[in-house]
Amino acid sequence: MAHLDGLWGSIYSFEGGRYFTKLPRGLRRRTTVSFSAPLNAEAATTRRVREILLTLGEAAFRLRTGANLAKRILKTLSEDPFRTALVDPTGDTKTLRAGELLAISRALAQRWKRSLPERRVGVILPPGTAGTIANIGLLFAGKVPVNLNPTLSESAARACLKQAGIETILTGALIQTKCTKFPWTSRVVHIENEIANTPRSRKLRHLATAFLLPTSLLLRPTGLGKIDPDSEAALLFTSGTSGLPKGVPLSHRNLLANILQVSETGFADKDDRLLTALPLFHSFGLTMGLFFPLVMRRTIITVPSPLDCDKLTEAARADAPTVLLATPTFLRHYLKWVPRHAFGTLRRMVSGAEKLPFELRTALHARFGCEVLEGYGLTEAAPVVSLNLSMPARGIGAETIQHGSSDGSAGRLLPGIAMKLLDPETLAEAPGAQRGLLALRGGNLVAGYLGEQAKEKFRDGWYITGDVVRVDDSGFLFLEGRVSRFSKIGGEMVSHGAVEEAIAEAFSGQPGQDCVVGVPCPDKGEELVLLTTRSIDREALRRNLASRAVPNLWIPRTVIQVPQLPAFASGKLDLAGCLKLAEKAAAERLPRSPACID
Protein backbone atom coordinates (compact mmCIF):
# COMPACT_ATOMS: atom_id res chain seq x y z
CA MET A 1 0.00 0.00 0.00
CA ALA A 2 1.08 3.58 -0.67
CA HIS A 3 0.25 6.79 1.21
CA LEU A 4 0.56 10.36 -0.14
CA ASP A 5 1.12 13.22 2.30
CA GLY A 6 1.32 16.96 1.65
CA LEU A 7 -1.23 17.35 -1.14
CA TRP A 8 -3.87 19.20 0.89
CA GLY A 9 -4.00 22.80 -0.28
CA SER A 10 -2.69 21.91 -3.74
CA ILE A 11 -4.78 22.01 -6.92
CA TYR A 12 -5.30 18.26 -6.45
CA SER A 13 -7.16 18.74 -3.15
CA PHE A 14 -10.68 19.90 -2.39
CA GLU A 15 -9.53 22.74 -0.14
CA GLY A 16 -11.99 25.59 -0.54
CA GLY A 17 -14.50 23.23 -2.15
CA ARG A 18 -12.74 23.27 -5.53
CA TYR A 19 -10.64 20.65 -7.27
CA PHE A 20 -7.98 21.50 -9.88
CA THR A 21 -9.74 24.70 -11.08
CA LYS A 22 -7.82 27.04 -8.77
CA LEU A 23 -4.49 28.81 -8.76
CA PRO A 24 -1.57 26.90 -7.22
CA ARG A 25 0.03 28.41 -4.12
CA GLY A 26 3.50 27.90 -5.51
CA LEU A 27 5.46 26.20 -8.24
CA ARG A 28 6.82 23.48 -5.96
CA ARG A 29 5.16 21.46 -3.20
CA ARG A 30 6.86 18.99 -0.91
CA THR A 31 5.04 15.67 -0.77
CA THR A 32 5.91 12.40 0.94
CA VAL A 33 5.15 9.00 -0.54
CA SER A 34 5.22 6.11 1.96
CA PHE A 35 4.93 2.38 1.31
CA SER A 36 3.90 -0.43 3.64
CA ALA A 37 4.99 -4.04 3.58
CA PRO A 38 2.96 -6.22 1.19
CA LEU A 39 -0.41 -7.41 2.51
CA ASN A 40 -2.14 -10.49 1.17
CA ALA A 41 -5.78 -10.37 0.09
CA GLU A 42 -7.12 -12.26 3.10
CA ALA A 43 -5.46 -9.90 5.58
CA ALA A 44 -6.45 -6.75 3.67
CA THR A 45 -9.67 -6.03 5.54
CA THR A 46 -11.00 -2.48 5.56
CA ARG A 47 -10.02 -2.03 9.20
CA ARG A 48 -6.51 -3.40 8.76
CA VAL A 49 -5.87 -1.28 5.66
CA ARG A 50 -7.07 1.81 7.52
CA GLU A 51 -4.76 1.10 10.46
CA ILE A 52 -1.75 0.74 8.15
CA LEU A 53 -2.55 3.92 6.21
CA LEU A 54 -2.98 5.87 9.46
CA THR A 55 0.42 4.62 10.63
CA LEU A 56 2.07 5.65 7.33
CA GLY A 57 0.34 9.03 7.48
CA GLU A 58 1.48 9.66 11.04
CA ALA A 59 5.13 8.98 10.15
CA ALA A 60 4.95 11.25 7.09
CA PHE A 61 3.22 14.05 8.99
CA ARG A 62 6.04 14.24 11.55
CA LEU A 63 8.43 15.30 8.77
CA ARG A 64 6.66 18.65 8.31
CA THR A 65 6.12 20.02 11.82
CA GLY A 66 9.58 21.35 12.59
CA ALA A 67 8.87 25.06 13.21
CA ASN A 68 8.14 26.70 16.56
CA LEU A 69 4.89 28.33 17.63
CA ALA A 70 6.32 31.75 18.55
CA LYS A 71 8.01 32.13 15.16
CA ARG A 72 4.86 31.04 13.31
CA ILE A 73 2.64 33.50 15.20
CA LEU A 74 5.08 36.36 14.61
CA LYS A 75 5.16 35.47 10.91
CA THR A 76 1.38 35.39 10.45
CA LEU A 77 0.80 38.60 12.42
CA SER A 78 3.50 40.52 10.54
CA GLU A 79 2.51 39.35 7.06
CA ASP A 80 -1.04 40.70 7.34
CA PRO A 81 -0.82 43.53 9.91
CA PHE A 82 -4.07 45.29 8.95
CA ARG A 83 -6.45 42.34 9.41
CA THR A 84 -8.63 42.16 12.52
CA ALA A 85 -7.01 39.58 14.80
CA LEU A 86 -9.04 39.97 18.00
CA VAL A 87 -12.41 41.38 19.02
CA ASP A 88 -12.94 41.82 22.77
CA PRO A 89 -16.27 43.60 23.40
CA THR A 90 -15.51 43.87 27.14
CA GLY A 91 -11.95 45.19 26.86
CA ASP A 92 -10.65 48.76 26.87
CA THR A 93 -9.59 48.22 23.26
CA LYS A 94 -12.51 46.56 21.49
CA THR A 95 -10.59 45.54 18.36
CA LEU A 96 -6.93 44.67 17.81
CA ARG A 97 -5.40 44.44 14.38
CA ALA A 98 -2.66 41.88 13.81
CA GLY A 99 0.03 44.56 13.70
CA GLU A 100 -1.18 46.12 16.96
CA LEU A 101 -1.25 42.73 18.71
CA LEU A 102 2.25 42.02 17.45
CA ALA A 103 3.55 45.42 18.61
CA ILE A 104 2.23 45.28 22.18
CA SER A 105 3.22 41.61 22.57
CA ARG A 106 6.79 42.30 21.40
CA ALA A 107 7.06 45.36 23.66
CA LEU A 108 5.97 43.33 26.69
CA ALA A 109 8.25 40.45 25.66
CA GLN A 110 11.26 42.78 25.83
CA ARG A 111 10.18 43.88 29.30
CA TRP A 112 9.52 40.32 30.56
CA LYS A 113 12.84 38.98 29.30
CA ARG A 114 14.49 41.21 31.89
CA SER A 115 11.92 41.28 34.69
CA LEU A 116 10.84 37.61 34.75
CA PRO A 117 13.92 35.42 35.29
CA GLU A 118 12.05 32.10 35.63
CA ARG A 119 11.22 29.92 32.61
CA ARG A 120 7.59 29.14 33.51
CA VAL A 121 5.17 31.94 34.37
CA GLY A 122 1.65 31.42 35.71
CA VAL A 123 -1.25 33.11 33.91
CA ILE A 124 -4.73 33.61 35.35
CA LEU A 125 -6.63 35.65 32.78
CA PRO A 126 -9.84 35.08 30.80
CA PRO A 127 -9.99 34.91 27.01
CA GLY A 128 -9.73 38.40 25.55
CA THR A 129 -7.17 41.13 25.03
CA ALA A 130 -5.30 40.61 28.30
CA GLY A 131 -5.20 36.80 28.07
CA THR A 132 -4.05 36.92 24.45
CA ILE A 133 -1.34 39.52 25.01
CA ALA A 134 -0.04 37.70 28.10
CA ASN A 135 0.31 34.35 26.34
CA ILE A 136 1.81 35.74 23.12
CA GLY A 137 4.13 38.11 24.99
CA LEU A 138 5.47 35.27 27.14
CA LEU A 139 6.05 33.11 24.05
CA PHE A 140 7.92 35.97 22.36
CA ALA A 141 10.01 36.38 25.54
CA GLY A 142 11.03 32.71 25.36
CA LYS A 143 8.95 31.89 28.46
CA VAL A 144 6.44 29.09 29.01
CA PRO A 145 2.92 30.36 29.83
CA VAL A 146 1.19 28.17 32.42
CA ASN A 147 -2.53 28.98 32.31
CA LEU A 148 -3.98 28.10 35.71
CA ASN A 149 -7.51 27.34 36.86
CA PRO A 150 -8.41 29.73 39.71
CA THR A 151 -11.43 27.61 40.72
CA LEU A 152 -9.33 24.59 41.75
CA SER A 153 -9.37 23.50 45.36
CA GLU A 154 -6.50 24.97 47.38
CA SER A 155 -4.73 21.60 47.62
CA ALA A 156 -4.99 20.98 43.86
CA ALA A 157 -3.84 24.53 43.05
CA ARG A 158 -0.83 24.22 45.38
CA ALA A 159 0.07 20.92 43.73
CA CYS A 160 0.00 22.59 40.29
CA LEU A 161 2.17 25.51 41.44
CA LYS A 162 4.67 23.17 43.05
CA GLN A 163 4.89 20.82 40.05
CA ALA A 164 5.48 23.71 37.64
CA GLY A 165 7.79 25.66 39.93
CA ILE A 166 5.68 28.79 39.53
CA GLU A 167 7.03 31.85 41.35
CA THR A 168 5.26 34.61 39.39
CA ILE A 169 1.64 34.83 38.26
CA LEU A 170 0.34 37.25 35.63
CA THR A 171 -3.25 38.25 36.33
CA GLY A 172 -5.58 41.23 36.72
CA ALA A 173 -6.07 43.15 39.95
CA LEU A 174 -9.82 42.49 39.95
CA ILE A 175 -9.28 38.76 39.39
CA GLN A 176 -6.88 38.55 42.34
CA THR A 177 -9.39 40.39 44.53
CA LYS A 178 -12.19 37.99 43.59
CA CYS A 179 -10.21 34.74 43.88
CA THR A 180 -9.52 34.94 47.60
CA LYS A 181 -9.21 31.17 48.09
CA PHE A 182 -6.51 30.71 45.44
CA PRO A 183 -3.01 30.26 46.94
CA TRP A 184 -1.34 33.20 45.20
CA THR A 185 2.44 33.19 44.92
CA SER A 186 4.54 35.84 46.65
CA ARG A 187 4.97 37.66 43.36
CA VAL A 188 1.82 38.63 41.42
CA VAL A 189 2.08 40.90 38.37
CA HIS A 190 -1.00 42.77 37.17
CA ILE A 191 -1.25 42.77 33.38
CA GLU A 192 -3.01 46.17 33.23
CA ASN A 193 -0.03 47.78 34.99
CA GLU A 194 2.43 46.06 32.65
CA ILE A 195 0.60 47.40 29.60
CA ALA A 196 0.25 50.91 31.10
CA ASN A 197 3.94 51.04 32.11
CA THR A 198 5.19 50.11 28.65
CA PRO A 199 6.31 53.38 26.99
CA ARG A 200 4.13 54.50 24.11
CA SER A 201 7.25 55.15 22.04
CA ARG A 202 8.26 51.49 22.36
CA LYS A 203 4.82 50.33 21.22
CA LEU A 204 4.91 52.71 18.25
CA ARG A 205 8.41 51.53 17.28
CA HIS A 206 7.29 47.90 17.26
CA LEU A 207 4.13 48.86 15.37
CA ALA A 208 6.18 50.64 12.71
CA THR A 209 8.58 47.72 12.29
CA ALA A 210 5.63 45.31 12.02
CA PHE A 211 4.28 47.34 9.10
CA LEU A 212 7.61 48.11 7.38
CA LEU A 213 10.01 45.20 7.88
CA PRO A 214 9.85 41.71 6.36
CA THR A 215 9.44 38.79 8.75
CA SER A 216 13.06 37.67 8.33
CA LEU A 217 14.34 41.00 9.70
CA LEU A 218 11.77 41.02 12.52
CA LEU A 219 12.98 37.60 13.63
CA ARG A 220 16.71 38.38 13.78
CA PRO A 221 16.90 40.27 17.10
CA THR A 222 14.32 38.06 18.84
CA GLY A 223 16.11 34.72 18.78
CA LEU A 224 12.77 33.01 18.12
CA GLY A 225 14.15 31.23 15.07
CA LYS A 226 16.52 29.26 17.33
CA ILE A 227 13.84 27.75 19.58
CA ASP A 228 13.86 23.94 19.50
CA PRO A 229 10.52 22.65 18.12
CA ASP A 230 10.55 19.92 20.78
CA SER A 231 11.00 22.37 23.66
CA GLU A 232 8.10 23.25 25.94
CA ALA A 233 5.76 25.93 24.56
CA ALA A 234 2.94 25.80 27.11
CA LEU A 235 2.12 23.87 30.25
CA LEU A 236 -1.43 22.86 31.08
CA PHE A 237 -2.88 20.68 33.80
CA THR A 238 -5.44 17.95 33.32
CA SER A 239 -8.81 18.58 34.91
CA GLY A 240 -8.08 15.93 37.52
CA THR A 241 -11.40 14.14 37.06
CA SER A 242 -10.06 11.10 38.89
CA GLY A 243 -7.26 12.53 41.07
CA LEU A 244 -4.87 15.48 41.38
CA PRO A 245 -4.17 17.37 38.12
CA LYS A 246 -1.20 16.16 36.06
CA GLY A 247 1.11 18.58 34.28
CA VAL A 248 1.05 18.29 30.47
CA PRO A 249 4.07 20.00 28.83
CA LEU A 250 2.99 20.82 25.26
CA SER A 251 5.88 21.39 22.87
CA HIS A 252 5.95 23.77 19.92
CA ARG A 253 5.78 20.69 17.68
CA ASN A 254 2.72 19.34 19.52
CA LEU A 255 0.73 22.55 19.19
CA LEU A 256 1.68 23.32 15.59
CA ALA A 257 1.01 19.72 14.56
CA ASN A 258 -2.51 19.89 15.98
CA ILE A 259 -3.18 23.27 14.36
CA LEU A 260 -2.05 21.88 11.00
CA GLN A 261 -4.03 18.67 11.50
CA VAL A 262 -7.26 20.58 12.16
CA SER A 263 -6.64 22.95 9.24
CA GLU A 264 -6.22 20.05 6.82
CA THR A 265 -9.73 18.81 7.54
CA GLY A 266 -11.13 21.98 5.97
CA PHE A 267 -12.77 22.73 9.33
CA ALA A 268 -12.52 26.52 9.07
CA ASP A 269 -13.26 28.62 5.99
CA LYS A 270 -11.05 31.59 5.16
CA ASP A 271 -13.67 34.10 6.28
CA ASP A 272 -14.61 32.33 9.52
CA ARG A 273 -14.81 34.32 12.75
CA LEU A 274 -14.48 32.16 15.89
CA LEU A 275 -16.50 33.03 18.99
CA THR A 276 -15.02 31.60 22.18
CA ALA A 277 -15.59 31.98 25.89
CA LEU A 278 -13.63 28.85 26.78
CA PRO A 279 -11.06 29.36 29.56
CA LEU A 280 -7.41 29.45 28.52
CA PHE A 281 -6.48 26.87 31.17
CA HIS A 282 -8.50 24.39 29.10
CA SER A 283 -6.64 22.86 26.13
CA PHE A 284 -9.68 23.33 23.86
CA GLY A 285 -9.75 27.04 24.71
CA LEU A 286 -5.98 27.56 24.44
CA THR A 287 -5.36 25.76 21.14
CA MET A 288 -8.63 26.20 19.26
CA GLY A 289 -9.68 29.48 20.87
CA LEU A 290 -6.29 31.22 20.68
CA PHE A 291 -3.38 29.58 18.85
CA PHE A 292 -5.34 28.04 15.94
CA PRO A 293 -7.02 31.28 14.79
CA LEU A 294 -3.82 33.29 15.26
CA VAL A 295 -1.74 30.90 13.16
CA MET A 296 -4.48 30.32 10.55
CA ARG A 297 -5.39 34.04 10.32
CA ARG A 298 -8.96 33.80 11.57
CA THR A 299 -10.58 36.51 13.68
CA ILE A 300 -11.14 35.66 17.36
CA ILE A 301 -14.21 37.06 19.14
CA THR A 302 -13.98 36.59 22.91
CA VAL A 303 -16.27 36.67 25.92
CA PRO A 304 -14.58 36.41 29.36
CA SER A 305 -17.01 33.89 30.91
CA PRO A 306 -18.76 30.98 29.16
CA LEU A 307 -21.72 31.39 31.54
CA ASP A 308 -22.30 35.09 30.81
CA CYS A 309 -25.09 34.67 28.29
CA ASP A 310 -25.84 38.41 28.12
CA LYS A 311 -22.31 39.29 26.97
CA LEU A 312 -22.22 36.26 24.66
CA THR A 313 -25.49 37.40 23.07
CA GLU A 314 -24.17 40.95 22.63
CA ALA A 315 -20.95 39.69 21.03
CA ALA A 316 -22.83 37.35 18.69
CA ARG A 317 -25.18 40.11 17.54
CA ALA A 318 -22.52 42.80 17.14
CA ASP A 319 -19.56 40.93 15.69
CA ALA A 320 -21.05 38.30 13.33
CA PRO A 321 -19.25 35.11 14.39
CA THR A 322 -19.55 32.08 12.13
CA VAL A 323 -18.17 29.37 14.46
CA LEU A 324 -18.86 28.88 18.18
CA LEU A 325 -16.53 26.78 20.36
CA ALA A 326 -18.16 25.33 23.48
CA THR A 327 -18.71 22.29 25.68
CA PRO A 328 -22.05 20.47 26.16
CA THR A 329 -22.38 21.96 29.65
CA PHE A 330 -22.21 25.50 28.27
CA LEU A 331 -24.34 24.65 25.22
CA ARG A 332 -27.16 23.58 27.55
CA HIS A 333 -26.88 26.99 29.17
CA TYR A 334 -27.08 28.77 25.79
CA LEU A 335 -30.06 26.67 24.76
CA LYS A 336 -31.92 28.00 27.78
CA TRP A 337 -30.75 31.61 27.96
CA VAL A 338 -29.55 32.83 24.53
CA PRO A 339 -32.32 34.28 22.30
CA ARG A 340 -33.20 32.24 19.22
CA HIS A 341 -31.95 34.78 16.66
CA ALA A 342 -28.78 35.87 18.49
CA PHE A 343 -26.72 33.24 16.66
CA GLY A 344 -28.07 34.22 13.25
CA THR A 345 -24.62 34.39 11.61
CA LEU A 346 -23.36 31.08 13.02
CA ARG A 347 -22.67 28.34 10.49
CA ARG A 348 -21.63 25.76 13.05
CA MET A 349 -21.15 25.03 16.73
CA VAL A 350 -18.22 22.81 17.68
CA SER A 351 -18.55 20.83 20.90
CA GLY A 352 -15.72 19.16 22.79
CA ALA A 353 -14.43 18.16 26.26
CA GLU A 354 -17.31 15.75 26.96
CA LYS A 355 -19.77 13.59 25.06
CA LEU A 356 -22.50 15.54 23.25
CA PRO A 357 -25.92 13.96 23.92
CA PHE A 358 -28.01 13.43 20.78
CA GLU A 359 -31.01 15.19 22.36
CA LEU A 360 -28.94 18.31 23.07
CA ARG A 361 -27.53 18.38 19.55
CA THR A 362 -31.02 18.07 18.06
CA ALA A 363 -32.43 20.80 20.32
CA LEU A 364 -29.57 23.20 19.48
CA HIS A 365 -30.03 22.68 15.75
CA ALA A 366 -33.80 23.19 16.03
CA ARG A 367 -33.41 26.41 18.04
CA PHE A 368 -30.47 28.10 16.32
CA GLY A 369 -30.56 26.52 12.85
CA CYS A 370 -26.82 25.82 12.54
CA GLU A 371 -24.79 22.63 12.42
CA VAL A 372 -23.64 21.18 15.73
CA LEU A 373 -20.44 19.17 15.33
CA GLU A 374 -18.84 16.96 17.95
CA GLY A 375 -15.14 16.31 18.35
CA TYR A 376 -12.96 14.30 20.70
CA GLY A 377 -9.80 15.51 22.33
CA LEU A 378 -7.33 15.17 25.16
CA THR A 379 -5.05 17.65 26.86
CA GLU A 380 -2.23 15.20 26.05
CA ALA A 381 -3.07 15.53 22.32
CA ALA A 382 -2.96 19.36 22.25
CA PRO A 383 -6.03 18.59 22.19
CA VAL A 384 -8.01 17.59 19.05
CA VAL A 385 -7.97 13.89 18.08
CA SER A 386 -11.07 13.48 15.93
CA LEU A 387 -13.75 15.72 14.47
CA ASN A 388 -17.03 15.52 12.62
CA LEU A 389 -16.99 17.74 9.53
CA SER A 390 -19.68 19.93 8.04
CA MET A 391 -20.24 18.86 4.48
CA PRO A 392 -19.79 15.61 2.58
CA ALA A 393 -16.44 15.57 0.76
CA ARG A 394 -17.09 14.94 -2.93
CA GLY A 395 -14.78 12.71 -4.92
CA ILE A 396 -13.78 13.13 -8.56
CA GLY A 397 -16.93 11.46 -9.82
CA ALA A 398 -20.31 12.99 -9.02
CA GLU A 399 -21.42 9.70 -7.44
CA THR A 400 -18.51 9.57 -5.00
CA ILE A 401 -19.33 11.13 -1.64
CA GLN A 402 -17.48 10.66 1.63
CA HIS A 403 -19.68 11.81 4.47
CA GLY A 404 -17.86 13.94 7.01
CA SER A 405 -20.02 13.13 10.02
CA SER A 406 -21.94 10.32 11.64
CA ASP A 407 -24.66 10.68 14.28
CA GLY A 408 -23.45 9.84 17.76
CA SER A 409 -19.80 9.66 16.76
CA ALA A 410 -16.84 11.88 17.63
CA GLY A 411 -15.78 11.94 13.98
CA ARG A 412 -12.77 10.48 12.20
CA LEU A 413 -9.17 10.76 13.36
CA LEU A 414 -7.34 13.86 12.17
CA PRO A 415 -4.60 13.38 9.57
CA GLY A 416 -1.21 12.59 11.07
CA ILE A 417 -2.57 10.52 13.97
CA ALA A 418 -2.20 6.74 14.19
CA MET A 419 -4.33 4.53 16.43
CA LYS A 420 -4.54 0.99 17.68
CA LEU A 421 -7.09 -0.77 19.86
CA LEU A 422 -5.99 -2.71 22.93
CA ASP A 423 -7.63 -5.25 25.17
CA PRO A 424 -8.74 -3.16 28.20
CA GLU A 425 -7.56 -5.80 30.68
CA THR A 426 -4.34 -7.16 29.16
CA LEU A 427 -3.36 -4.15 26.98
CA ALA A 428 -2.55 -6.63 24.20
CA GLU A 429 -2.94 -5.21 20.69
CA ALA A 430 -5.90 -6.45 18.66
CA PRO A 431 -5.24 -5.70 14.95
CA GLY A 432 -8.45 -5.16 13.01
CA ALA A 433 -10.58 -5.06 16.17
CA GLN A 434 -13.81 -3.05 16.21
CA ARG A 435 -13.80 -2.13 19.90
CA GLY A 436 -11.11 -1.63 22.51
CA LEU A 437 -8.97 0.69 24.60
CA LEU A 438 -7.71 3.50 22.38
CA ALA A 439 -3.96 4.14 22.01
CA LEU A 440 -2.67 7.05 19.91
CA ARG A 441 0.55 8.24 18.32
CA GLY A 442 1.24 11.48 16.48
CA GLY A 443 3.18 14.72 16.39
CA ASN A 444 0.51 16.34 18.55
CA LEU A 445 0.89 13.79 21.39
CA VAL A 446 3.10 14.74 24.33
CA ALA A 447 6.06 12.55 25.27
CA GLY A 448 5.04 12.30 28.94
CA TYR A 449 3.70 14.11 31.96
CA LEU A 450 5.57 16.67 34.03
CA GLY A 451 7.81 14.97 36.57
CA GLU A 452 7.37 11.58 34.90
CA GLN A 453 3.96 10.99 36.44
CA ALA A 454 1.83 8.06 35.22
CA LYS A 455 4.62 6.73 32.99
CA GLU A 456 2.59 3.58 32.36
CA LYS A 457 0.30 5.57 30.03
CA PHE A 458 3.18 6.10 27.57
CA ARG A 459 4.47 2.93 25.89
CA ASP A 460 6.88 2.74 22.95
CA GLY A 461 5.75 6.09 21.56
CA TRP A 462 2.05 5.35 22.08
CA TYR A 463 -0.24 7.16 24.51
CA ILE A 464 -2.87 4.96 26.17
CA THR A 465 -5.87 7.26 26.43
CA GLY A 466 -7.94 5.34 28.96
CA ASP A 467 -10.97 5.65 26.65
CA VAL A 468 -12.85 2.63 25.35
CA VAL A 469 -14.04 3.26 21.79
CA ARG A 470 -15.79 1.53 18.93
CA VAL A 471 -14.70 2.20 15.34
CA ASP A 472 -17.18 1.57 12.53
CA ASP A 473 -16.40 0.48 8.96
CA SER A 474 -16.16 4.11 7.80
CA GLY A 475 -13.58 5.03 10.45
CA PHE A 476 -15.85 6.99 12.80
CA LEU A 477 -15.03 6.84 16.52
CA PHE A 478 -17.81 6.16 19.02
CA LEU A 479 -16.85 6.81 22.64
CA GLU A 480 -18.10 4.17 25.06
CA GLY A 481 -16.52 5.61 28.19
CA ARG A 482 -13.36 5.78 30.25
CA VAL A 483 -11.89 2.42 31.17
CA SER A 484 -12.06 3.72 34.74
CA ARG A 485 -15.80 4.16 34.17
CA PHE A 486 -16.36 0.45 33.72
CA SER A 487 -17.00 -1.92 36.61
CA LYS A 488 -16.31 -5.63 36.53
CA ILE A 489 -19.35 -7.20 38.20
CA GLY A 490 -19.71 -10.96 38.28
CA GLY A 491 -17.12 -11.24 35.49
CA GLU A 492 -18.97 -8.81 33.19
CA MET A 493 -17.72 -5.35 32.17
CA VAL A 494 -20.46 -2.79 32.87
CA SER A 495 -20.28 0.72 31.37
CA HIS A 496 -21.22 3.51 33.79
CA GLY A 497 -22.00 5.80 30.86
CA ALA A 498 -24.40 3.29 29.30
CA VAL A 499 -26.26 2.98 32.62
CA GLU A 500 -26.49 6.78 32.88
CA GLU A 501 -27.96 6.97 29.37
CA ALA A 502 -30.52 4.29 30.22
CA ILE A 503 -31.54 6.19 33.37
CA ALA A 504 -31.91 9.48 31.46
CA GLU A 505 -34.10 7.73 28.88
CA ALA A 506 -36.17 5.91 31.51
CA PHE A 507 -36.96 9.05 33.49
CA SER A 508 -37.37 11.41 30.52
CA GLY A 509 -34.79 13.84 31.81
CA GLN A 510 -31.83 15.74 30.48
CA PRO A 511 -28.46 13.95 30.51
CA GLY A 512 -26.04 15.27 33.10
CA GLN A 513 -28.35 14.77 36.08
CA ASP A 514 -26.87 11.41 37.05
CA CYS A 515 -23.48 9.88 37.78
CA VAL A 516 -22.89 6.16 38.22
CA VAL A 517 -19.78 5.03 40.09
CA GLY A 518 -18.46 1.68 41.23
CA VAL A 519 -17.60 0.91 44.85
CA PRO A 520 -16.06 -2.28 46.30
CA CYS A 521 -18.44 -5.15 47.02
CA PRO A 522 -17.29 -8.29 48.90
CA ASP A 523 -19.61 -10.59 46.92
CA LYS A 524 -19.19 -9.45 43.30
CA GLY A 525 -16.05 -7.32 43.35
CA GLU A 526 -17.91 -4.07 42.67
CA GLU A 527 -21.41 -2.68 42.87
CA LEU A 528 -22.93 0.37 41.23
CA VAL A 529 -24.01 3.49 43.09
CA LEU A 530 -26.18 6.18 41.48
CA LEU A 531 -25.69 9.83 42.40
CA THR A 532 -28.59 11.86 41.03
CA THR A 533 -30.23 15.26 41.22
CA ARG A 534 -33.58 13.64 40.37
CA SER A 535 -36.15 12.44 42.86
CA ILE A 536 -35.80 8.67 42.33
CA ASP A 537 -36.22 5.79 44.74
CA ARG A 538 -34.44 2.51 44.20
CA GLU A 539 -37.58 0.48 43.47
CA ALA A 540 -38.70 2.90 40.75
CA LEU A 541 -35.19 2.76 39.30
CA ARG A 542 -35.20 -1.05 39.26
CA ARG A 543 -38.68 -1.25 37.75
CA ASN A 544 -38.03 1.31 34.98
CA LEU A 545 -34.69 -0.12 33.92
CA ALA A 546 -35.92 -3.72 34.03
CA SER A 547 -38.83 -2.78 31.75
CA ARG A 548 -36.25 -1.59 29.21
CA ALA A 549 -34.41 -4.93 29.35
CA VAL A 550 -31.46 -3.47 31.25
CA PRO A 551 -29.60 -6.43 32.83
CA ASN A 552 -29.97 -6.75 36.59
CA LEU A 553 -26.19 -6.43 37.06
CA TRP A 554 -26.37 -2.98 35.45
CA ILE A 555 -29.00 -1.61 37.86
CA PRO A 556 -27.40 0.45 40.68
CA ARG A 557 -28.00 -1.08 44.09
CA THR A 558 -27.76 2.25 45.90
CA VAL A 559 -29.33 5.63 45.07
CA ILE A 560 -27.99 8.84 46.61
CA GLN A 561 -29.77 12.11 45.96
CA VAL A 562 -27.55 15.20 45.78
CA PRO A 563 -28.47 18.84 45.13
CA GLN A 564 -25.70 19.12 42.54
CA LEU A 565 -23.16 16.79 40.97
CA PRO A 566 -19.50 17.78 41.57
CA ALA A 567 -18.10 19.46 38.44
CA PHE A 568 -15.14 21.54 37.26
CA ALA A 569 -15.23 25.05 35.78
CA SER A 570 -15.14 23.55 32.27
CA GLY A 571 -18.38 21.70 33.03
CA LYS A 572 -16.66 18.32 33.18
CA LEU A 573 -17.90 15.97 35.86
CA ASP A 574 -15.58 15.68 38.87
CA LEU A 575 -15.46 11.88 39.01
CA ALA A 576 -13.14 11.84 42.00
CA GLY A 577 -15.60 14.03 43.88
CA CYS A 578 -18.51 11.77 42.89
CA LEU A 579 -16.62 8.70 44.04
CA LYS A 580 -15.85 10.32 47.40
CA LEU A 581 -19.56 11.02 47.93
CA ALA A 582 -20.44 7.41 47.12
CA GLU A 583 -17.70 5.99 49.35
CA LYS A 584 -18.63 8.34 52.18
CA ALA A 585 -22.26 7.25 51.97
CA ALA A 586 -21.21 3.60 52.00
CA ALA A 587 -18.92 4.11 54.99
CA GLU A 588 -21.24 6.24 57.08
CA ARG A 589 -24.49 4.61 55.99
CA LEU A 590 -26.06 7.99 55.28
CA PRO A 591 -29.85 8.06 54.65
CA ARG A 592 -30.63 6.77 51.18
CA SER A 593 -33.72 5.79 49.26
CA PRO A 594 -35.73 3.00 50.93
CA ALA A 595 -34.60 -0.16 49.18
CA CYS A 596 -30.90 0.37 48.59
CA ILE A 597 -29.62 -3.15 49.02
CA ASP A 598 -31.03 -6.22 47.32
Describe each PLM feature range.
Residues 1-43:
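A cross-family acyltransferase "interaction/gating" segment
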Residues 81-82, 126, 189-237, 244, ...:
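Conserved pre-ATP/AMP-binding loop-to-beta segment of ANL
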Residues 85-132, 136, 153-158, 208-212, ...:
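Conserved AMP-binding/adenylate-forming core of the ANL superfamily
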Residues 169, 324, 442, 447-448, ...:
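AMP-binding/adenylate-forming catalytic core of the ANL superfamily
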Residues 211, 321-326, 335-405, 418:
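Gly/Ser/Thr-rich phosphate-binding loop
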Residues 256-273, 281-322, 337:
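Conserved AMP-binding/adenylation subdomain of ANL enzymes
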Residues 393-396, 409-416, 425-459, 492-494:
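Conserved ATP/PPi-binding loop(s) of AMP-dependent carboxylate-activating enzymes
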Residues 526, 550-573, 591-597:
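AMP-binding/adenylate-forming catalytic domain of the ANL superfamily
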